[in-house]
Amino acid sequence: MAASSWRGAVLLRTVSGLWQAGPDAAREWMTRLPSLLGFQQRCVSCVAGPAFSGPRLASASRPNGQNSALDCFLGLSQPDNSLPFRVPAVSVHRDEQDLLLVHRPDMPENPRVLRVVLLGAPNAGKSTLSNQLLGRKVFPVSKKVHTTRSQALGVITEKETQVILLDTPGLISPAKQKRHHLELSLLEDPWKSMESADLVVVLVDVSDKWTRNQLSPQVLRCLTQFSQVPSILVMNKVDCLKQKSVLLELTAALTEGVVNGKKLKTKQALRSRPDTHCPSPAAQGPNPQPVRDPQQMGWPHFQEIFMLSALSQEDVKTLKQYLLAQARPGPWEFHSEVLTSQTPEEICANMIREKLLEYLPEEVPYNVQQKTVVWDEGPSGELVIEQKLLVSKESHMKILIGPKGYLIAQIAQEVGRDLMNIFLCEVQLRLSVKLLK
């Protein structure tokens, strides 16, 4: 069949299928037909295991007129939400994704850019926050530590501004990396990211009462070594706190009582305003021989403090607008259609791994090897993926398959939904479990 006829047939089929999943999903897909490189997404709904209800596409927007809880805290006016922000999809074809990554950026006349590093302890919520800021789930998320195994890159492009998010693994010590035989990338990637950062977002999970009262030694060491890089503090998961007054105490502890170069009084801890910046010692230039006080628990050089719940997206949009406002004049690094630097195969493998971490107990998910054996286009234009999950113990195999194959089918179904929202295409995902010999 000729390419034009084939694409026309698939277009009719897929738009019809997507409309069943929801008119919003269909409209979003239709807006992506014209593309800079002449590529067209060739599929639209997702089939993975049993039938499922239509997905809800992630969105960074909120209803017009909805006030932010941080208005008084940060003094930020509400952005104009009259025009919806369109989030790019990721191509299902690796060569198309690679070509787009190296394509000349379609910059406006006065481009602005900002490279942001998300820093924090393992499982602080960095990937969840990155997904919410991007408006589409492209990074794996789970409650288990070390879900992010290496640095991942996401791109926000709005109007003249491009913000590049570097989602790094949680900072760990060399001793922990060696003791648990973790990949070297878990140790090195956060430090490498800091070398090109324009802004550091330090994320603290305030729902963890064991760690919330101080920054981890690894985070403090990183901030000290790169003290010339501006930083802000994001206190995450505040919705989990029953007593909001605890936030005042945590603010004082994590900032050592200083924000934006000014000492805070208890009643002033939640009144930092972005229009009253004062240069902090950290902004004066790099410290050639950074020395960290071993008794130090917080960082006194944060420019701003944000309190939010990344999971419910409460006030995430306010943080996003702040990041866009911090961008500096400079050339874009990517075309506006780039959402992430990950290949489609990497995204798929990460999403499957996310579900393994979520549903499998203890050490089981960490001992599963993944091998993609099929990544092809089906007869109707759908994306067909087949991945083998290799385990070394028969007991692990039984756990992964589940009673009557229910668990492996559920994983395939849920991953399929995620992949549809990422690729905006029909996906047939087949998972099989094999015992290593």
Swiss-Prot record:
Gene Ontology cellular-component terms listed: mitochondrial inner membrane; mitochondrial matrix
UniProt-annotated stretches for the region G4: 236-239
InterPro entries: G_ERA_dom (IPR030388), GTP-bd (IPR006073), GTPase_Era-like (IPR005662), KH_dom-like_a/b (IPR015946), KH_dom_type_2 (IPR004044), KH_sf_prok-type (IPR009019), P-loop_NTPase (IPR027417), Small_GTP-bd (IPR005225)
Highest taxon above the source species: Eukaryota
Keyword Acetylation: no
Keyword Lipid biosynthesis: no
Transit peptide extent on chain: 1-43
GO BP annotations listed: ribosomal small subunit assembly
Residues in KH type-2 domain copies: 360-437
Residue numbers spanned by region Disordered: 264-296
NCBIfam families listed in its UniProt record: small_GTP
Function description: Probable GTPase that plays a role in the mitochondrial ribosomal small subunit assembly. Specifically binds the 12S mitochondrial rRNA (12S mt-rRNA) to a 33 nucleotide section delineating the 3' terminal stem-loop region. May act as a chaperone that protects the 12S mt-rRNA on the 28S mitoribosomal subunit during ribosomal small subunit assembly.
Membership in a protein family: Belongs to the TRAFAC class TrmE-Era-EngA-EngB-Septin-like GTPase superfamily. Era GTPase family.
Name under which the protein is recorded: GTPase Era, mitochondrial
